[in-house]
């Protein structure tokens, strides 16, 4: 919410979120609920994927690498998939772009990063 407010961007202007997506039951539902609290219960045009599904958790480098992937998504107008997503947990019902990358027209993309000990950060990128 703060990233959007600071940028002067409305939630409905964001087309893609590169989620932290650690594939843990508690973490995935918490992130899904946070996304829904800002973007609505079932945001129709919002794609959410986790680049972490393809590379694992890079610990201290995760936020930087995921930001680069988010920027490349805007440049290439292609959303990377969440691989190996066959049966999302109950309540995890967003468009997680399963298995296959998707072409998409995007102007804004958000990257979520959560750290050990409760540090959270989200950064909003705009296509230029």
Region locations from a protein language model:
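Conserved "HGTGT" condensation-loop signature of ketosynthase/thiolase-family condensing enzymes
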Residues: 1-128
């Amino acid at each position: 919410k703060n990233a959007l407010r600071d940028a002067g961007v409305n939630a409905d202007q964001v087309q893609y979120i590169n989620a932290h997506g650690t594939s843990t039951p508690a973490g995935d539902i918490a992130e899904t609920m946070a996304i829904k609290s800002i973007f609505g219960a079932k945001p129709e045009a919002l794609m959410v994927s986790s680049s972490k599904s393809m590379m694992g958790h890079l610990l201290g480098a995760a936020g930087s690498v995921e930001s680069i992937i988010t920027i490349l998504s805007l440049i290439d107008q292609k959303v990377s998939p969440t691989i190996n997503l066959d049966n999302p947990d109950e309540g995890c019902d967003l468009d997680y772009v399963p298995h296959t990358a998707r072409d998409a027209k995007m102007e804004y993309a958000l990257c979520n990063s959560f750290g050990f000990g409760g540090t959270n950060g989200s950064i909003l990128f705009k296509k230029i």
